[in-house]
Amino acid sequence: MEETNRQKKIGGLLQKDLADILQNSLRESGRTGILISVSKVRVTTDLSIAKAYVSIFPSKHQEEVIKEINENKSQIKHEMAQRTRHQLRKMPDLSFYVDDSLEYIDGIEKSIKGKEDPVANPDLLDKRKKS
């Protein structure tokens, strides 16, 4: 089902504010060398739940940063509610997920360019089939 205009607008608003809050919290905690971005926010049709997909670079810090974000979810929700109090009546419940789409794309590119190229070597297709 396609998102409505309202869902898209709220998702964009939440995405912008979430990115700002998460980057500020990383800066305040003294963690340097970690880049965090909110790649997508999907809001349910009743606007009660928002799923935020977060990209973290370098990827070796993904698990600990997501764990830290989930531990501070209530504080993040409160700050989001303060920022969006004039646009939203009720702040949706937030859930955070690691966005691994860039790694997935990178894996596809490596398999095409690397030695496991199924186009150049059709024998590899038999290995990839699910039994």
From Swiss-Prot:
Belongs to the RbfA family. It comes from the Bacteria. It holds the Pfam family RBFA. InterPro entries: KH_dom-like_a/b (IPR015946), RbfA (IPR000238), RbfA_dom_sf (IPR023799). Keywords: Cytoplasm, Ribosome biogenesis. This is Ribosome-binding factor A. GO terms for molecular function: ribosomal small subunit binding. It is found in: Cytoplasm. One of several proteins that assist in the late maturation steps of the functional core of the 30S ribosomal subunit. Associates with free 30S ribosomal subunits (but not with 30S subunits that are part of 70S ribosomes or polysomes). Required for efficient processing of 16S rRNA. May interact with the 5'-terminal helix region of 16S rRNA. GO terms for cellular component: cytosol. GO terms for biological process: maturation of SSU-rRNA. It comes from Christiangramia forsetii (strain DSM 17595 / CGMCC 1.15422 / KT0803). Monomer. Binds 30S ribosomal subunits, but not 50S ribosomal subunits or 70S ribosomes.
